[in-house]
């Protein structure tokens, strides 16, 4: 469809909005007084920064935009563009791996370690945490409960999420939502990378 749809996500106190731009649609440039993080969830398109900078965005890409930077979006003509917009606090703990105005593939920010799970925190603030994790073959997180709702973004490979006693397979490009205090575990099938928004 050729519509633009935005939906507020109630995952945390931080303002999170899911946007779906239909084929060939756009959002005019605007700026925020706070930093903004964009996470591509589906399709492809462009982000237009300031006067004439253009960066391409697609699934599992991440873009950090500095405060007071003009930013508009346009969807591709084939499949549209979907992304999550996160308005961050002015004072935030942001990992230096993220550079303002650069599109980054999340899965390329973290390497595998033999027999281990590696974790890289990208954003940390009181009401929001965003991290990426790399599970070597056979590694897993034991059953546990999280203090808030969360979304998993499968970045590479395949994993099995056990959620409240039921197994769910997630593959690159898939997302999975956890409710607050839901019992869950995650196991790699082969090597597996994911991002977690909590």
What are these regions, as identified by a protein language model?
Residues 51-68, 164-181:
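Short acidic-glycine-tyrosine-enriched beta hairpin
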Residues 41-42, 58, 155-156, 171-172, ...:
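A cytosolic small-molecule/anion-sensing beta-strand core signal
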Residues 67-92, 180-198:
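Ligand-binding loop in jelly-roll beta-barrel domains
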Residues 1-15, 58-59, 63, 78-127:
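A short, N-terminal "cap"/entry segment at the start of jelly-roll beta-barrel domains
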Residues 2-4, 15-32, 115-119, 129-146:
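Conserved short histidine dyad/triad with adjacent acidic residue
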Residues 20-21, 31-46, 133-136, 145-160:
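Short, conserved beta-strand element in jelly-roll/cupin
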Residues 16-20, 37, 62-64, 130-134, ...:
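Conserved hydrophobic/aromatic beta-strand scaffold that supports enzyme active sites
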Residues 12, 50-51, 162-166, 189:
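Short strand-coil-strand connectors
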């Amino acid at each position: 469809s050729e519509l633009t749809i935005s939906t507020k996500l109630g995952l945390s106190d931080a303002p999170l909005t899911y946007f779906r731009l239909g084929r060939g649609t756009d959002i005019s440039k605007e700026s925020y007084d706070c930093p903004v993080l964009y996470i591509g969830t589906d399709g492809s398109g462009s982000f237009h920064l300031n006067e004439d900078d253009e960066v391409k965005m697609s699934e599992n890409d991440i873009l950090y935009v500095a405060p007071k930077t003009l930013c508009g979006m346009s969807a591709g003509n084939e499949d549209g563009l979907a992304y999550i917009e996160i308005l961050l606090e002015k004072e935030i703990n942001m990992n230096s791996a993220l550079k303002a105005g650069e599109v980054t593939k999340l899965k390329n920010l973290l390497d595998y370690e033999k027999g281990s799970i590696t974790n890289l925190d990208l954003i940390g603030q009181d009401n929001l945490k965003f991290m990426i994790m790399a599970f070597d073959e056979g590694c897993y997180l034991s059953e546990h409960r999280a203090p808030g709702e969360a979304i998993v973004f499968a970045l590479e490979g395949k994993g099995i999420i056990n959620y409240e006693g039921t197994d769910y397979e997630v593959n690159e490009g898939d997302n999975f939502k956890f409710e607050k205090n839901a019992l869950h575990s995650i196991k790699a099938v082969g090597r597996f990378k994911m991002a977690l928004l909590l």
